């Protein structure tokens, strides 16, 4: 996911007793966003990220939907979502604790190239969204914990790269090229929503771009992406809002610039998709770069 900003960081959302969600960034990975959370009731609305989502379940079970499948992620599982994979999430069997990171395509390709020596390698693809791998889970969890605590930047940096290499070497197909770059009618509609997310687009705009009738467009769009055109537009707006928050813009200004009616609308959409709200809080960045500021 796109990271948070100093002065306009993403603060913890109001959760039920015993729940928490903490979003932080790893400075040594150019602001790589990380999440540590425990949920017993909170559910995520369907959403997508510009980045991968790679993480592990520490305890409990998460029920989620992705790639047209109903999935269960349990203790010791590794979880993989590709960029723009639409997914949701809900507690199952009493709730769950998990750690998650949101690496860019460039970072995952960098690790894949170091494993294979092939600089022409495509976008790493994980055939299974969830795999049982206690050893890989422990490796990832320890690196994530070190990054969160911020005590030893080099250890966290090395550990996370080792964890990503483990995931790629054991669970990824490195021969797949250009995930999500199809050029069909739905791709054309998605491109318009990505480009003009701050406008009040109509179905007529999307039909002109895609060449599909309105009723066909809605059904086909949902079948291919998992979201209706409107839900996809809101998701794009949230992703672009996070980019602006990272640059230090205020939530009110960000809401106006990204097509939301007001800050309250932004907050509701943000919370539903990401588990945290945009708010004024002191950002904690992990790594030597930011520790030197204190």
What does each model-found stretch correspond to?
Residues 1-20, 285:
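Short, low-complexity, intrinsically disordered N-terminal peptides in bacterial proteins
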Residues 11-12, 19-121:
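N-terminal regulatory/effector-sensing and dimerization cores
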Residues 115-178, 191:
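Amphipathic alpha-helical segments enriched in hydrophobic/aromatic residues interleaved with Lys/Arg
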Residues 142-152, 163-174, 189-202, 221, ...:
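Basic, amphipathic alpha-helical hairpins
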Residues 181-189, 225, 234-237:
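N-terminal positioning helix adjacent to the helix-turn-helix/winged-helix DNA-binding module
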Residues 194, 199-236, 243-246, 255-280:
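Basic/polar phosphate-binding segments, predominantly the helix-turn-helix DNA-binding elements
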Residues 283-290:
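Conserved small/polar residues in nucleotide/adenosyl-binding loops
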